């Protein structure tokens, strides 16, 4: 299949939503409840507040290609450095093959920067993330070389407690001899359950430059123990042979405010 270029991916969400950058007083504040990039694949369309540090962590068990694996801690560290702007880093996660033909090893460390460009904060939110997986992990797990990516998570609050969310990501693998580009699209239907809990169902599609796509249905939920702490879970089921047969995970996230 044909993939849109970087310029098209950058411009399309902005044109559709009529985006102009959010002003500082419309950005997330320390009194805002925690908004995480987990447990769904789709990341939050909001950044962490300026002066706040957020840590998101989780473990998964999965089955694919006839083998079982465990991975953790899937840690993402996020720091609000300016209004509507954060820096983040995905720390190396260890993937342990339990049985079957799967490989074991660490994933890459992946720094990034995220900018919130909400055209209508609280109703329509959009962010742009630019990052790269640095070649620190096991090649059998993550593939060869540096892997830059661009990403656009968005959300739209509907009537009542419902919202729809989604994300488009382009992963570039310049020195991969076969697949130099993978595009991932997600779509989420989410519902708030009271003031502190939420549930979701999510579609995830990975489309490679060469080879067949992978389709996954993911569902789960989370609970805010406090306004700055969250526990969560998810269960994903693959829809074709290119996706994991299943993946189940749990997680815990927290945020510290007013650091500067």
Positions of PLM-derived features:
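C-terminal region of N-terminal signal peptides and the immediate post-cleavage residues
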Residues: 19-23
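Transmembrane beta-barrel domains of Gram-negative outer membranes and organellar outer membranes
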Residues: 24-260
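N-terminal secretory signal peptides that target proteins for export/translocation
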Residues: 1-5
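Bacterial N-terminal signal peptides
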Residues: 7-18
């Amino acid at each position: 299949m044909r993939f849109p270029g970087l310029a098209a991916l950058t411009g399309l969400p902005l044109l559709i939503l009529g985006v102009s950058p959010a002003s500082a007083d419309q950005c997330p504040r320390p009194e805002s409840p925690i908004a995480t990039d987990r447990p769904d694949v789709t990341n939050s369309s909001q950044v962490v507040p300026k002066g706040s540090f957020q840590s998101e962590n989780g473990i998964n068990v999965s089955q694919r290609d006839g083998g079982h694996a465990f991975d953790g801690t899937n840690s993402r560290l996020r720091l609000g450095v300016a209004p509507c702007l954060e820096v983040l880093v995905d720390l190396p996660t260890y993937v342990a093959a339990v049985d079957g033909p799967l490989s074991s090893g660490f994933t890459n460390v992946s720094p990034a920067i995220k900018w919130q460009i909400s055209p209508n904060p609280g109703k329509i939110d959009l962010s742009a993330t630019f990052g790269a997986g640095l070649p620190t992990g096991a090649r059998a797990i993550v593939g060869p070389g540096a892997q830059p990516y661009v990403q656009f998570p968005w959300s739209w609050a509907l009537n009542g407690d419902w919202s729809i969310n989604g994300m488009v990501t382009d992963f570039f693998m310049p020195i991969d001899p076969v697949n130099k580009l993978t595009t991932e699209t997600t779509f989420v239907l989410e519902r708030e359950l009271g003031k502190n809990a939420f549930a979701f169902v999510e579609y995830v599609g990975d489309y490679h430059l060469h080879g067949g796509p992978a389709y996954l249905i993911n569902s789960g939920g989370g609970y805010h123990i406090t306004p700055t702490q969250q526990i969560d879970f998810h269960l994903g089921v693959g829809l074709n042979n290119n996706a994991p047969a299943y993946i189940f995970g749990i997680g815990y996230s927290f945020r510290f405010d007013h650091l500067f």
